C-alpha cells in the first residue's frame, strides 16, 4: 500500500512536506483518536499552517461521511450517511445490556451480487467505498462518544469484492489510529474465494463469517448467484484451509426462509456438509438467523419453534449452533434490510 493512499498517509506526507518534525503527525493522530476532535481547526496544538493545509485538503471535519437520517430503537441505531459525491450508505450501531457496543458497517454503495433474500442487492451496485469512507463510518460513532468494542463488515456490499477492504482493516488495526484488535473485527462474505485466501495470509486473527443459506449447490445457486462462480464445495475447502492455517473458528450464517431451506432434509444436509471434514471441524459454528422481511423481497419469516427444531437437529449431530438474537428489525436495521431508502 502506498503511504499516501489513505488520508492518514496523506496527513503524514503533509507534515513532511511542510518540513515539520515527525511528532506533529503523532499529535494529530492523538487529537483524533485520544481526544476525539473532529474539527481540524480545533486541534490547537498543531501549527496554524498545518491546520490550514488539513482543512484545504480534507475539509473542516476529519470524518468525511455526513449523517442525513437516523432511526433509533431500544438497542439499535441506524445511520444513513451521505458521501462527498452524493452517494449514500447505511451503518448500524448496536448496544447490548452488558454495555458492549458493536457496529455493522458498509463496504460498498449497494451490491451487485443479487442474493434474492437481501434488500441491499435490489438497489444494484453503485461503487466501492474507499478505505477512508469505510473507516469514517466508525469515526462518526467514535466522535459521538461510542465505544468501538466490535466491528462487523455486514452492512451494504460484499467486503471481499472491494480492493480497499484490506487498507481499511490496516487502518482499524493500526495501534496509532483506531488500535483495534483483529479479533474484534468480523468480515462476512458470500464466498469470494480469493478474498478469503488473502484474509488468511494478511489478517489471520480477523473473524470470518460465511453466508451459507443452503447446503445444496443448485438451490444455493438459485438463492445466491455467486455460487455458480464459486461453488459451495470449493468455498468449503478454502474455509478448511483458513481454519487449518489460523486455528480460528469460522461462523456460518444461515438465514431461515420458510418453505425454502428450513426442512429436516436441509438440516441433515448441513450436518453432512460439516461432519467428517477433519480434526478442525469443531471450529465451524452455525449461526441461524430469523429472516427479516422487507418490501424488496418475498420470503416469509420462519416460526421460532421451527428454527429451534432446526437448531436441535444440528446440535444432536454434534454441530455447534445457536440462534442469533436480532436487534433493529423494527427500524429495518437487521440482517438483509439495509437499502438506503430513508431521507429527511
From Swiss-Prot:
Active site: 90, 335
Gene Ontology MF terms: 4 iron, 4 sulfur cluster binding; metal ion binding; rRNA (adenine) methyltransferase activity; rRNA binding
Chain sites annotated for binding [4Fe-4S] cluster: 111, 115, 118
Chief location bin: cytoplasm
BP GO annotations: response to antibiotic; rRNA base methylation; tRNA methylation
Any Gene Ontology CC annotation: cytoplasm
Keywords: 4Fe-4S, Antibiotic resistance, Cytoplasm, Disulfide bond, Iron, Iron-sulfur, Metal-binding, Methyltransferase, rRNA processing, S-adenosyl-L-methionine, Transferase
Record protein name field: Ribosomal RNA large subunit methyltransferase Cfr
Lineage: Bacteria, Bacillati, Bacillota, Clostridia, Eubacteriales
